[in-house]
Each structure stands twice: as structure tokens, then as C-alpha cells.
Amino acid sequence: MGIIVFYEGNNGTQNIVQTVEDTPGQNFRPVKNDEIRSAKIYGVRQGCEIGVYDSPDGATNDDFCIINVKRETPEYTINTFERSYEDEYVVVTFIRNNGLDGKISRIKIN
């Protein structure tokens, strides 16, 4: 099982807000609303999709970001949820409305 650690600061810094496994089918509100700004993934499985949403019910009419894991890696940092990019490990897709970092109210993992 892989581990996803959500952080209060950008670049995987400051306090840990919440730690979860990469088990598919998760859909939850973070333990602290509007705190998360970045994440680190540890051994998260290929094909895992991590979604973070500004909307408390995970609606896509507000800011959201989807991280698709292309390849398992021992440790990888998602520095911000406000940038779309692709590398050998992840595809990150950010849809902007008025900003997402520090405003996350729903997390989905599949």
C-alpha cells in the first residue's frame, strides 16, 4: 500500500495535515478544511488517481486538481496543486477558478 501525506505548506513543508493510504474508492473531507497546499507520495501504485477539490462536495465547477500516478516511486513531492504538468512519474491537471492551494475541502482517491 502506498502512502499520501498532505502538507500545510507548499513543497511538502510545514505541518502534516493528514496521511492516508492509496486505497481506491476514498472520498472524504480533510481533517482540517482549507489547510492543504502540497503532498508527498510514497510508493503510491501506478494508475492511482488523487483528486483535490475546493468544493466541499467535490464539484468540478470550482478549482480542482487531479494527479494521475504513471509510475510508482519511493518518494515524490507535489509542490503545489496550482500547476498542470507531466513527468515520468505523474500527470497533474489543474483547473483554475480562484486558487486551490490552502483551500482544499474534498479529497478523492481511486
List the model feature ranges, each with a label.
Residues 1-110:
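Compact beta-sheet-dominated domain cores in extracellular/mature segments
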